[in-house]
Each structure stands twice: as C-alpha cells, then as structure tokens.
A protein has these predicted regions:
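Small-molecule-sensing regulatory modules
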Residues: 100, 109, 117-120, 125, ...
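Acidic/His-rich segments in extracytoplasmic proteins that coordinate ligands and/or metal ions
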Residues: 1-38, 115-158
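Short acidic/glycine-rich loop or secondary-structure boundary segments that cap or lie
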Residues: 82-86, 139-141
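Internal, well-ordered alpha-helical scaffold/interface segments
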Residues: 33, 50, 78, 93-100, ...
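Extracytoplasmic substrate-binding proteins
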Residues: 4-83, 105-110, 160-179
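Alpha-helical, coiled-coil/dimerization segments enriched in small aliphatic residues
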Residues: 87-114
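Short gly/pro-enriched beta-turn/loop segments at secondary-structure junctions
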Residues: 67-71, 101, 124-126
Length: 179
C-alpha cells in the first residue's frame, strides 16, 4: 500500500507481516512461506504451495499450445477515452505475468509496469486481444469499454475488429492462492 499507510500501521506497535508487492508466481510462493513461518503453520503452507504449483504447471501446459502463434494481449486498467489516456500493463507487471500464464504475449513491450496508453499507442500496439480490468470501485466501466470500441481511430485495431475485447475481474491482478 501507500508508504504513509505503512508508516501509520508501524506506529501502532503491533506485529505485522509485510509482504512484497507480488508480480511473479514465485513471489507468491515465498510470501506463503513467510506467513506460514510467522504463524507456525508449515503443513498448511506446504499443501497450499503444492496446490499453487499444480495450477502453475497446468497453466504452463495449457499455454504451450499457443507457443508459436501466441496472441498479443493488452491488459488495460482503464481504456483510453476521447481526451484521456488509459492505463496499460507493460513488461514486469502483474498483467504481464497473467498474459504469460494464459499463453499470450504482452502487446505493451515498450514500457515496464503500468503506464498511460493513448489511442495512438493502442493503434501502434495493435493487440489481438484486449482485456479491461473491472471492479466495483476501479477499472473500466462497461460504458468506457463500449466508448473505446466505438472510437473511430481504433476501428482497425485487431482486437476491436475481431470483437476480442473482454472485461475481466480486476481482482485477477491480486496475486493470491487462487492465481
């Protein structure tokens, strides 16, 4: 979370386990181990780690089917609007990891983390698939997604031409045991 929130919690003088901001599945496994150590629940952690590893192996096996012809995928936290940029997940982001685990190639290779994505840059990326994160409080609204799809400047983007624009739960970026 924000640094000021962490500082406030540290002042409470209570035992807190600080976990890193996860961007890769391996980091999830080490976080599970950290928590289990502090809670003295190694047996529970072992079972959970085995379950997560099974899921990762299955995801890798499923995604290997796409290896040569993997679609390019753009994950947007917010789609670009008429006068605003959207927010896209570049390399070394949770979005990048999810795209990889699903068997795709990240279309946003020009930057790392989450950065603004303009209409022009979306045209240049020309992804085969666009995923737009949604939640109750954040992400693209159904209206903003429809507005993006209806934007004339984006009409020749492959994902829009093929109708391959999907709303996905923004919670998918919260790497936890259900990864």
């Amino acid at each position: 979370g924000p640094p000021n929130a962490r500082q406030m919690l540290e002042r409470l003088d209570i035992d807190i386990i600080w976990l890193p901001n996860l961007t890769k599945p391996e980091e999830l496994l080490s976080s599970i181990e950290m928590v289990s150590e502090r809670l003295a629940r190694a047996e529970v952690a072992e079972a959970l780690i085995e379950d997560v590893n099974r899921g990762l192996i299955q995801a890798a096996a499923n995604s290997s089917n796409w290896a040569e012809d993997a679609p390019t995928v753009l994950f947007l936290l917010e789609p670009p609007g008429k006068s605003t940029s959207g927010m896209g997940g570049g390399l070394n982001s949770k979005a990048d990891t999810l795209i990889f685990l699903a068997g795709g190639k990240n279309a946003a290779t020009e930057f790392s983390g989450f950065k603004p994505v303009s209409t022009e840059s979306l045209v240049a990326m020309n992804p085969d698939v666009i995923l737009v994160g949604q939640s109750d409080r954040h992400g693209g609204s159904p209206e903003s997604i429809q507005a993006m799809i209806a934007t004339p400047a984006l009409s020749e983007v492959s994902a829009i031409e093929k109708g391959a624009v999907y709303a996905v739960p923004l919670d998918d970026l919260a790497f936890g045991p259900r990864l």
